[in-house]
Amino acid sequence: EDLRNVTPPKVSLFEPSKAEIANKQKATLVCLARGFFPDHVELSWWVNGKEVHSGVSTDPQAYKESNYSYCLSSRLRVSATFWHNPRNHFRCQVQFHGLSEEDKWPEGSPKPVTQNISAEAWGRADCGITSASYQQGVLSATILYEILLGKATLYAVLVSTLVVMAMVKRKNS
């Protein structure tokens, strides 16, 4: 193999189609690694920081695009409900086995060494809620809960004070 043509992949992650989600209640994420040479790559899926194997379908081998370029695709299928949770984080990771430290490489250009290249996406809420707006909603709900709890505590103290005052007044009369 010609070491001068060693090139790491460009990795893209495509989100599931709305039609698939609506019709099948499933969500398929597609990972595409392309433009790499040689074809020494390993592709893995990670969900919420943990590697997953269930629901994964990866091409059996990299396809040759041209003399010095390969591509590889993989799919991860999850339930529509799981995809619609904005807290779920999906990552496609491609480990590219490039040059070793001993391999000769021309000065002035970056040496394509073994490296991990990733693309990622967050789950999308069904009603257009993003992760940031979801977190803002949780924060607002927490603040509202604390205000209501404070009001209830204040009301309990006020009622208790009135009851004690009534008992003292009754005892004195």
Curated annotation (Swiss-Prot):
GO terms for cellular component: alpha-beta T cell receptor complex. The keyword Transmembrane applies. Keywords: Disulfide bond, Glycoprotein, Immunoglobulin domain, Membrane, Receptor, Transmembrane, Transmembrane helix. InterPro entries: Ig-like_dom, Ig-like_dom_sf, Ig-like_fold, Ig_C1-set, Immune_Resp_Modulators. It is found in: Membrane. Residues 168-173 are cytoplasmic. The chain crosses the membrane at residues 146-167. Glycans are attached at residues 67, 116. Disulfide bonds join 31-71. Signal peptide: none annotated. It is a single-pass membrane protein. Residues 1-146 are annotated as: C region. Pfam families: C1-set. Clone B10.A was isolated from a cytotoxic T lymphocyte. This is T-cell receptor beta-1 chain C region.
